[in-house]
Amino acid sequence: MKLRPLHDRVVIRRSEEETKTAGGIVLPGSAAEKPNRGEVVAVGTGRVLDNGEVRALAVKVGDKVVFGPYSGSNTVKVDGEDLLVMSENEILAVVEA
């Protein structure tokens, strides 16, 4: 199954959780925080402005992004994988290599 988000929505695959701290301590699954980074896997057509124009999104498929800890409260399961659906304005930054 493939998701096609509407308007200014973005579908994100969350990055893998860190299971070890910088000091080398292994964290159990319940203690590890969910990462607030991910990869954009689908984008909508754009934000519809008050005048009816559509503004293209600033993110694109494949972008690595950072989002807030409470962003993406809408989780959907697609082919056994949990994906986040959020508005573009919930994305804080694009990670550039």
UniProtKB/Swiss-Prot annotation:
The parts of the chain that form a coiled coil are: none
Against InterPro entries, the record matches this protein to: Chaperonin_GroES, Chaperonin_GroES_sf, Chaprnonin_Cpn10_CS, GroES-like_sf
What are the recorded GO MF terms, alphabetically? ATP binding; metal ion binding; protein folding chaperone; protein-folding chaperone binding; unfolded protein binding
PROSITE patterns, per database record: CHAPERONINS_CPN10 (PS00681)
**GO biological process per UniProt:** chaperone cofactor-dependent protein refolding
- What UniProt keywords are attached to this protein's entry? Chaperone, Cytoplasm
Q: Where is this protein chiefly located?
A: cytoplasm
Q: Which domain of life is it from?
A: Bacteria
Q: Which Pfam families match?
A: Cpn10
The subcellular location is:
Cytoplasm
| Gene Ontology CC: one annotated term | cytoplasm
Q: What does this protein do?
A: Together with the chaperonin GroEL, plays an essential role in assisting protein folding. The GroEL-GroES system forms a nano-cage that allows encapsulation of the non-native substrate proteins and provides a physical environment optimized to promote and accelerate protein folding. GroES binds to the apical surface of the GroEL ring, thereby capping the opening of the GroEL channel.
Self-association and partners: Heptamer of 7 subunits arranged in a ring. Interacts with the chaperonin GroEL.
User: So what family is this one in?
Assistant: Belongs to the GroES chaperonin family.
Which named protein is this? Co-chaperonin GroES
Species assigned in the record = Stutzerimonas stutzeri (Pseudomonas stutzeri)
Name of the encoding gene: groES
